[in-house]
Amino acid sequence: MNHYLRAIGSMLILVYSMLTAFLFIDKVFVNIIYFQGMFYTQIFGIPVFLFLNLVIILLCIIVGSILAYKINQQNQWIKSQIEHAIEGETVGINDQNIELYNETIDLYQTLVPLNQELHRLRMKTQNLTNENYNMNDVKVKKIIENERQRLARELHDSVSQQLFAASMMLSAIKETKLEAPLDQQIPVLEKMVQESQLEMRALLLHLRPLGLKDKSLGEGIKDLVIDLQKKVPMKVIHDIQDFKVPKGIEDHLFRITQEAISNTLRHSNGTKVTVELFNQQDYLLLRIQDNGKGFNVDEKLEQSYGLKNMRERALEIGATFHIVSLPDSGTRIEVKAPLNREDDNNDD
């Protein structure tokens, strides 16, 4: 709206300035026509002087509105290009076939190298991540991984087995005739044990995550989903495209997927989780979505170790990390990681 007002105001000032200059310069026009004719001659019952002013104002409004609309189109297009650049997507797409002004094209041509530089920095971040993946910190990660494996084994051999035994005992007790209030308490206890088993499986997934080993990212996620479908009551759906992704990036994305699913199993109280992986040419899209209870993103993002860990992993590979969640509306996590197009071309 501000663009319209500025354009209309500018046109009015310009036209009136030209008209005033013309009237002052041409004294003959002022004496003969302006005073003698315009006040006495009428058009549609309106003095010519007033009619001409109304026509000029109307023309200014029409022309100014058209110009303001076109300028607003240019600004919106540039804004969309900047947003594409920030997200790591291709710039220069003109879906609405807008006629671009020379100034807009000049600004776009300035934006292109900035987008290329941003993409280069993202890829450099990925390369550094791949290099760090094979450096000395792998030893530290190995020590931590071994400790996590040890804790996971102990939990599986002790607590997990005890929960399973308790579940079997409760199932057997349910088959017998019980008097009140035991007949009402046993189902409650059984539900609590089942929830504890689900929590334990999520914790074991967090402590002892499956590794990709020689698998691709797509294959690893599919195997993870198939394994979960056998062990958890929640419905797990996947839509996975299998394509080449650098090893260091694959590992980070796989860990993000595991962390997101683990959080879903432990906290969402949902009945379904969907895992999607797509190749969008310039970038890949990883999406994990559930139909659970949701949460306040601003509060949880600072408090939850899991969410912060996922965001940090995404930033390490130059990816964007977005969470959309509302109470009673589920949660959606999206990770967009740029793909190295030059490497893909070389592989071809």
Curated annotation (Swiss-Prot):
CDD domains (UniProt xref) = HATPase_UhpB-NarQ-NarX-like (cd16917)
Q: Which InterPro entries match?
A: HATPase_C_sf, LiaS/VraS, Sensor_HK_TwoCompSys, Sig_transdc_His_kin_sub3_dim/P
Q: Could you say which enzyme class this protein belongs to?
A: transferase
A single GO cellular-component term on record? plasma membrane
Recorded GO MF terms: ATP binding; phosphorelay sensor kinase activity; protein dimerization activity
Where is this chain's protein located in or outside the cell? Cell membrane
Q: How does it sit in the membrane?
A: Multi-pass membrane protein
EC number, as in UniProt: 2.7.13.3
Q: What is the lineage of its organism?
A: Bacteria, Bacillati, Bacillota, Bacilli, Bacillales
Catalytic activity annotation:
ATP + protein L-histidine = ADP + protein N-phospho-L-histidine
Q: What is its main location?
A: membrane
Transmembrane region(s): 13-33, 43-63
The Histidine kinase domain extends over: 150-341
Q: Which UniProt keywords apply?
A: ATP-binding, Cell membrane, Kinase, Membrane, Nucleotide-binding, Phosphoprotein, Transferase, Transmembrane, Transmembrane helix, Two-component regulatory system
Q: What is this protein called?
A: Sensor protein VraS
What is this protein for, i.e. what is its function? Member of the two-component regulatory system VraS/VraR involved in the control of the cell wall peptidoglycan biosynthesis. Probably activates VraR by phosphorylation.
